[in-house]
Amino acid sequence: MGVVVSLDEGKRKAAASIAPLVEATRDAMDRVNELILDRCGSDVGMIPEVARHLIDSGGKRLRPMLTIASASMCGYRGSGHVKLAGSVEFMHTATLLHDDVVDESDLRRGKLAARMIWGNQASVLV
């Protein structure tokens, strides 16, 4: 038999369930976030604006956390996993931007979708 869970309760349970993963990947995720911020720079003024909008819109960064955790579980000791995790997050973000254009979404994570601010073409190109 199924159980209906309120959205607020579901969010709290989800956050609690990934807390051990967040803690286990904290140091490497700090480096991933630094990498993401560093790579969002550009001489084209709109690119950092769109990037900042996306970064500030939240999200759990679950995919890069899983990348970091997988590297750790496999005994990886290098630093390449940070770049890989950043790449995974960039790819995910690109799919979200594209999805918002295709679906003509006005909002992403409760904020105006990038396409609503900068238009469809700019959102896809960034």
Annotated model-derived regions:
Residues 1-4, 118:
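Acidic, low-complexity proline/glycine-rich segments
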Residues 20-126:
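Mg2+-dependent prenyl diphosphate-binding active-site environment of isoprenoid biosynthetic enzymes
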Residues 14:
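ATP/NTP phosphate-donor binding region
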